């Protein structure tokens, strides 16, 4: 396993550096590293490491969401108002509707199969979007109008909404009954996640105020509590649950609100941890990609993904109607909401594992969506934000 860790870090960082020199997103190099080192090409990664790949990816996601929370300006979101709430579910709903319209015609899927495919693809990738929005906030681009805060918060909640839809549609395919409670649980889990996160942040702020410990110990405490929140959500069997990832982000928000000095120092350490976490995250996402499936994908699947993204961008545009954003800022927000990676890698293979007839198609299109949209979306954000957004002086 030590050899695998060394290969992931050295090759991942090396390929990232090469891609950046070529003016391409570094994550493209990391994804390619994972694909080449993974079980479907050279098979150089230890099987035991791949068995815990999903846990390692979740740990990396927790680190960047915590970092996002520590720097998220809630007052900026309040100023935006209703569009901030709409961004959490309207773009994903539009993309799902696009799949329902296009997938039966292009791939011959039933409406329910198209809904399952749409719910797999409709989530934006926080692993791609969140670190870039954090960088924009640090550099001051678009912050006056709350643009990076809007995208960051929406991308985090969007995943919760889509995963609940995927679970519901998969249940219908298996013949299970669907209750109204499963849909009511979407807003409830988000709100509960916010409350639990803020409460935990407040408690930690009080603790750090009374007990003086090193910042390194503080971040270890934050990470441990974040892991416990995720485990608690995974083991909940009640009808009402909470979103652990939202709780993790709002843990950072709460600490920033009640103990800002400590939050700023911890945010710096989170940023340093993300250097290694990002490499593991995208290399391991790449390792899940079976390029053999791509040989079965025709032009129709590419057209389907592009068509669904047009629906998604239309959904973002609808959310932004009535805001004070200009055309360039709206276009940037629409582009920033397109990358796919983490959710698709996590749930893309589930329909096949459950024996659904559409399983092969869903996994193939999910793989293609990662390969196409993660690097292209990252490139669109990286190359346009200085041109499209205003820097706060």
Q: What label would you give each PLM region?
A:
Residues 1-393:
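Transmembrane helical cores of multi-pass secondary ion antiporters/exchangers
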């Amino acid at each position: 396993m030590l050899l695998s860790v060394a290969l992931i870090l050295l090759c991942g960082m090396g390929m990232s550096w090469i891609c950046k020199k070529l003016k391409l997103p570094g994550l493209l190099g990391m994804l390619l590293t994972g694909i080449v080192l993974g079980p479907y090409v050279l098979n150089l990664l230890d099987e035991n490491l791949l068995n815990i790949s999903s846990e390692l990816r979740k740990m990396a996601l927790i680190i960047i969401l915590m970092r996002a929370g520590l720097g998220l300006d809630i007052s900026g979101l309040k100023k935006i108002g209703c569009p901030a709430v709409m961004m959490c579910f309207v773009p994903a709903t539009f993309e799902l509707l696009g799949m329902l319209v296009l997938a039966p015609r292009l791939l011959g899927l039933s409406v329910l199969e198209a809904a399952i495919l749409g719910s797999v693809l409709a989530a934006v990738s926080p692993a791609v979007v969140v670190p870039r929005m954090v960088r924009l906030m640090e550099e001051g681009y678009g912050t006056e109008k709350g643009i990076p805060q809007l995208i960051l918060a929406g991308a985090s909640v969007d995943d919760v909404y889509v995963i609940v839809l995927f679970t519901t549609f998969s249940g219908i395919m298996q013949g299970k009954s669907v209750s109204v409670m499963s849909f009511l649980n979407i807003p409830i889990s988000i709100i509960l996640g916010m409350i639990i996160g803020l409460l935990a942040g407040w408690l930690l702020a009080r603790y750090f105020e009374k007990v003086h410990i090193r910042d390194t110990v503080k971040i270890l405490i934050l990470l441990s509590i974040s892991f416990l929140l995720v485990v608690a959500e995974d083991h909940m069997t009640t009808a009402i649950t909470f979103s652990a990832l939202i709780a993790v982000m709002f843990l950072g928000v709460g600490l920033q609100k009640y103990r800002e000095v400590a939050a700023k120092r911890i945010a710096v350490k989170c940023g340093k941890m993300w250097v290694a976490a990002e490499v593991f995250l995208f290399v391991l996402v790449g390792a899940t990609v079976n390029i053999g499936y791509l040989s079965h994908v025709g032009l129709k699947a590419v057209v389907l993904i592009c068509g669904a993204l047009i629906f998604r961008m239309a959904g973002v545009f609808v959310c932004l109607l009535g805001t004070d954003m200009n055309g360039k800022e709206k276009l940037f927000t629409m582009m920033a909401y397109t990358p796919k990676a983490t959710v698709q890698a996590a749930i893309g293979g589930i329909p096949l594992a459950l024996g659904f007839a559409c399983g092969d198609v869903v996994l193939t299109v999910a793989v293609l969506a990662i390969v196409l949209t993660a690097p292209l979306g990252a490139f669109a954000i990286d190359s346009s934000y200085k041109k499209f957004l205003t820097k706060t002086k």
